[in-house]
Structure formats: structure tokens, C-alpha cells
Amino acid sequence: MTTIVSVRRNNQVVIAGDGQVSLGNTVMKGNARKVRRLYHNKVLAGFAGGTADAFTLFERFESKLEMHQGHLMRAAVEMAKDWRSDRVLRKLEALLAVADTECSLIITGNGDVVQPENDLIAIGSGGNFAQAAATALLENTDLSAKEIAEKSLTIAGDICVFTNQFKTIEELNY
């Protein structure tokens, strides 16, 4: 699987992800980009789960963003509706973490949209490790959102065998 983490602090939101693609217990690729910018570089998105499934979700989500003029919450809710009713989407095994300058969301494999209370998202096999590290850093340091995302991803990569140290980090400042 992978680890994706999103942190929001001091007018900055970041989504970061590692680059490992695994097939069973074998590492197939170490430098995959699982974090992207969407909708005229105004929305960040990261995925955890099956790579082919995630690319399908990226395409569908980007079309929803276009349809709703970049309104993240509306696009996410519409995507979730499709996910629940579309037979192809229901079989996709992936999670999306998405963020813009106003909100951060998780779109789950069940078609749920979750807005975390503290604007911290961590998904994937190393998500719990990254979330614990990011929470501690948010509560006990003055590090930037980017620094927290990077450090928490490093910690997750040190612990989780399905997460490596190759990082893709995207940020929005507002």
C-alpha cells in the first residue's frame, strides 16, 4: 500500500506521499507519484490503495471538480454519490485525501466523505504511524505544515514495510 499525509497549519496545506508500489510482498517501484495537483493547481490530492484504481478515481474526481468549478466539498460529495451507485467504482480499492485552501477531506472506499476535526489526514498502510507523528509535532512544535508532513512521512517509512523514503510533497499557501 502506501502512506499519504495531509497537514494544515498557518495558511499552508500540504499533502505528501511516499513512492512505493508493492505487489504482495514485492516492491515493484520505488518512485511513484501518488500526490497530484488538480483543477488549475488549486486542489491537492493523494491516493492510497491500488494504483490503477487510484488513477481511475483521480480522473473521475477531476471531472467532478471541473463540473463544480473547483468547489471541493461539492465535488467530493458528488464523487461519493457516484462511488456508491456505480458498479465499477464500488469495486475500486483506494482512498483519496484531498485539500484546497478551505478544507481537507478523505473520500473513502465506501463512498464516505470525512472532514477531519483537526485538518490532519493520514491514510494507507503507514497512516496510523504518520498520524501519530504528525499529531505530536502539531501539538509540541512550531514546525510548518510542510516540515510536519515530511517528518511524519519519514517516521512512517521507518516503521511500515509498505512505505519508503521517496517523497512527493505538494503545498498550497493562502
From Swiss-Prot:
The lineage of its organism: Bacteria, Pseudomonadati, Pseudomonadota, Gammaproteobacteria, Alteromonadales. Belongs to the peptidase T1B family. HslV subfamily. It catalyses: ATP-dependent cleavage of peptide bonds with broad specificity. GO terms for molecular function: metal ion binding; threonine-type endopeptidase activity. It comes from Shewanella loihica (strain ATCC BAA-1088 / PV-4). GO terms for biological process: proteolysis involved in protein catabolic process. It is found in: Cytoplasm. Keywords: Allosteric enzyme, Cytoplasm, Hydrolase, Metal-binding, Protease, Sodium, Threonine protease. It comes from the Bacteria. It is an enzyme of class 3 (hydrolase). This is ATP-dependent protease subunit HslV. Its EC number is 3.4.25.2. Na(+) binds at residues 157, 160, 163. The gene is hslV. GO terms for cellular component: HslUV protease complex; proteasome core complex. PROSITE patterns: PROTEASOME_BETA_2 (PS51476). Protease subunit of a proteasome-like degradation complex believed to be a general protein degrading machinery. The keyword Signal does not apply.
